[in-house]
Amino acid sequence: MALQDVCKWQTPDTPRPSIHLPQAGGWAVPRGCDPQTFLQIHGPRLAHGTTTLAFRFRHGVIAAADTRSSCGSYVACPASRKVIPVHQRLLGTTSGTSADCATWYRVLRRELRLRELREGQLPSVAGTAKLLAAMMSCYRGLDLCVATALCGWDHSGPALFYVYSDGTCLQGDIFSVGSGSPYAYGVLDRGYHYDMTIQEAYTLARCAVAHATHRDAYSGGSVDLFHVRESGWEYVSRSDACVLYRELQKARSLEQELEAKACGIYPEPATPQGARECKELFVEQEEVTPEDCAIIMKTETM
């Protein structure tokens, strides 16, 4: 929740000029109309679909995403890049409108470079997240759609922040954004712990995105994997999501078979006494003859 929501603050009717986008404010709307109201009524409704995730652990920050860019049922690009480098120690995942994400990441790079020249150092990950949230909050209510997870390493260690176009800025250990995020969260919540090894983190990220692409119709293609270390970010791999999911299913089936054998779901009797007890449990009942009925009736009359 953004600070504006907590304070019950509403965006002004006329957006103020932005110092970050010099051409902002010249909205192509009829004269006398409020841009915010006009866009909410007549603006195009764009379809979004993606799966991006990031999580922080002892050895840095992992960022992963699928590569399918889609607009509804139309697949625009099966091999797009949804994890964008900002500088040597900072990455960002992109979810939302592609044009908005690309524009604001260019603006963010420019602002960070200017601050580096003025102050002699780059801002922290927290400062970068607050800067991006403040810049985009000027366009709150104008159908801007940018949801990003900033993954970086600064003087405080690995850091992860979620920033949304309405000004929301959250810090956390796990974030997943996009239409496939509910499926990715299910895998992440089950396998995540802060002290995991690097290979465990790689496997968890690939597994989460692969499961999301299998269940979410708007995610697919391949799985891009990045790792942010103290020395900088590293591009780990790109794996086909369909092939990866099949391999995970085979590994899961093999693991279940081994667990079944180890737990002894179909155990054999360990002793002759156990064998006799099992045999008694499944022995067939003898048929009741007329002589038996006569004996029973005689016993009842007595």
Curated annotation (Swiss-Prot):
Keyword Phosphoprotein among record annotations: yes
Family label: Belongs to the peptidase T1B family.
Subunit composition and interactions: The 26S proteasome consists of a 20S proteasome core and two 19S regulatory subunits. The 20S proteasome core is composed of 28 subunits that are arranged in four stacked rings, resulting in a barrel-shaped structure. The two end rings are each formed by seven alpha subunits, and the two central rings are each formed by seven beta subunits. The catalytic chamber with the active sites is on the inside of the barrel. Incorporated instead of PSMB5 and PSMB8.
A GO MF label: threonine-type endopeptidase activity
Enzyme class per UniProt: hydrolase
Tissues and organs where the protein is expressed, per its UniProt entry: Expressed exclusively in cortical thymic epithelial cells.
Origin species: Mus musculus
PTM annotation (Phosphoserine): residues: S253
Catalytic residues in the record: T50
Name this polypeptide is given: Proteasome subunit beta type-11
One GO cellular component term: nucleoplasm
Knockout consequences: Displays defective development of CD8-positive T-cells in the thymus.
Pfam families, sorted: Proteasome (PF00227)
